[in-house]
Amino acid sequence: MANQIYLFSLICLSVLLCQSYTVSSFQKSLDLAKPCKRFVLHLHDIAYDGDNAANATSAAIVNPLGLGDFSFGKFVIMDDPVTMDQNYLSKPVARVQGFFCYHGKATYDAWIAWTVVFNSTQHKGAFTIMGENPFMEPTRDLPIVGGTGDFIMTRGIATLTTDHIDGSKYFRVKLDIKLYECYH
């Protein structure tokens, strides 16, 4: 248990040290009605259940601590395919790599750190989504806090909608990406 807490603390510290904001000396007005880039993606997650190592795209590396009914303390790492449509078998256009941890003791709640990594003819680079994901809500807005490549220093909003759940083995999330600072 001490090793799990140490591992969790080390991962959180690494994320905080790797993410930084660039402060500029000028204010740029943002038109929230007109993002500079917008696209809709679909994340597909297959949870590891002990028998599906070849197909699993996520795995719990710290299990719930038994402190309630809402998986408090569970820590999941993921490398999920992202498609342009809802079909899991469609060609992936990106991957979501990162983690989420359940941190609500009174309701299902997760804090996420995801990097959407593109390597296609259309886009190269990545952007990062971080924040509170109250996934029992129909839609959730999470901040996009930066990026690389085609998404260098981008900022925006990712609106998440869980559009399919198959027990604890599979879920699909629609990502409505709206970027408001674009340099490419």
From Swiss-Prot:
Glycosylation sites: N55, N119
Pfam families listed in its UniProt record: Dirigent
Keywords recorded for this protein, A-Z: Apoplast, Disulfide bond, Glycoprotein, Secreted, Signal
Coiled-coil ranges from the UniProt annotation: none
GO cellular component, one term: apoplast
Disulphide bridges: C36-C182
UniProt keyword Secreted present: yes
GO biological process annotation, one example: phenylpropanoid biosynthetic process
First and last residue of the signal peptide: 1-20
UniProt-listed Gene3D superfamilies: Allene oxide cyclase-like
Transmembrane intervals: none
InterPro entries: Allene_oxi_cyc_Dirigent, Dirigent
Subcellular location: Secreted, Extracellular space, Apoplast
Family: Belongs to the plant dirigent protein family.
Stated role: Dirigent proteins impart stereoselectivity on the phenoxy radical-coupling reaction, yielding optically active lignans from two molecules of coniferyl alcohol in the biosynthesis of lignans, flavonolignans, and alkaloids and thus plays a central role in plant secondary metabolism.
Subunit structure, interactors included: Homodimer.
Protein known as: Dirigent protein 14
Protein source organism: Arabidopsis thaliana (Mouse-ear cress)
